């Protein structure tokens, strides 16, 4: 990535925060579509499906990998952060499972299969709320700690570990 020092931290953290903004926008759209499902109107299931395809690819495979690298460095410096870092790691795995479960339901719907509205809505809302709660912990706790604790060399290490992947949103 060719990032060093303070610039490296800025670039990495700006990307993570930008990703969260994009993800939050998508969650608003998902929530709107779950409201449509709840009201027994015709949701745009292809849109919801496309959002979940994105969510189960970029955030689950790239964004969370970068966070995990940052959080691992953080846990090396801040023993009080180990609990939240461990929690966030477990949540990354949980988010991937929840996302794939929701995506599988959406594939069935898009393919014309019958899926109970309340099951679909509850699965969608559970995913949305879990992800929002997860990002809130990162933004209020883990990100600020990492920004304070990691050295320039740590940010260089993280940057050199990141594959050059561009967020498709």
What is each stretch, according to the model?
Residues 2-169:
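Small-residue-biased structural context
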């Amino acid at each position: 990535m060719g990032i060093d020092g303070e610039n490296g931290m800025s670039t990495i953290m700006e990307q993570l925060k930008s990703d969260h903004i994009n993800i939050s926008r998508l969650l608003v759209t998902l929530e709107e579509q779950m409201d449509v499902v709840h009201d027994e109107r015709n949701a745009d299931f292809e849109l919801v499906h496309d959002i979940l395809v994105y969510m189960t690819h970029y955030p689950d495979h790239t964004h969370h990998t970068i966070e995990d690298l940052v959080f691992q460095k953080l846990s090396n410096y801040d023993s009080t952060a180990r609990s939240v870092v461990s929690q966030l790691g477990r949540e990354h795995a949980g988010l991937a499972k929840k996302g794939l479960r929701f995506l599988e339901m959406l594939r069935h719907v898009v393919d014309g299969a019958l899926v109970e509205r309340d099951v679909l809505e509850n699965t969608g809302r559970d995913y949305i709320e879990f992800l929002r709660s997860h990002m809130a912990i990162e933004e209020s706790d883990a990100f600020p700690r990492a920004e304070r604790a990691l050295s320039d060399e740590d940010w260089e290490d993280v940057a050199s570990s990141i594959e050059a992947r561009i967020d498709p949103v």
